[in-house]
């Protein structure tokens, strides 16, 4: 696992939107914006178990993530990693609510099934342009 620098940690600790790239069955990339959180220096993303990214990650755990600072869009980080755990049920909702509070200051709305993918970081890079 790659340790994250303070500038990368700051990007993931803030309410910044990340973009997650996974691989479809045919090898084509699939990229979506996500809310993201930190769990013991690993990354956590939430999704529906029926989503395309969940199907992709269930088949191939490799993932690439980019994130930019919403207040300073020239600051960015790029991550490569792999899913090491899938969390469901009440343990997932605890993580989901922590992530939701970061973005909207309230628990995540209930009513739809959600899971959390825990991502171990293999490579991390940060840069501020300009």
PLM regions: where:
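Extreme N-terminal tail/first-helix region
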Residues: 1-17
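Charged, gly/pro-rich active-site loop segments
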Residues: 2-3, 75-130
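Hydrophobic alpha-helical segments typical of transmembrane helices
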Residues: 4-8, 53, 95
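Short beta-strand segments
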Residues: 15-49, 64-67, 77-78
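Short beta-strand segments in beta-sandwich/barrel cores
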Residues: 18, 43, 63, 83-84, ...
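A short, aromatic/hydrophobic, helix- or strand-capping loop or linear motif
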Residues: 24, 67-70, 106-113
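Short, surface-exposed beta-strand-loop junctions and turns on beta-sheet-rich folds
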Residues: 51-53, 72
């Amino acid at each position: 696992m790659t340790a994250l620098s303070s500038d990368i940690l700051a990007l993931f600790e803030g309410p910044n939107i990340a973009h997650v790239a996974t691989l479809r069955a045919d090898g084509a990339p699939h990229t979506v914006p996500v809310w993201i959180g930190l769990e013991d220096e690993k990354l956590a993303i939430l999704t529906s178990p029926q989503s395309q990214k969940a199907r992709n990650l269930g088949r191939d755990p490799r993932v690439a993530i980019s994130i930019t600072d919403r207040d300073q869009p020239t600051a960015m980080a790029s991550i490569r990693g792999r899913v090491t755990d899938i969390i469901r049920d009440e343990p997932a909702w605890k993580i989901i609510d922590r992530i939701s509070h970061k973005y909207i200051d309230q628990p995540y709305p209930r009513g739809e099934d959600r899971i959390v993918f825990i991502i171990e970081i293999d490579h991390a890079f940060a840069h501020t342009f300009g």
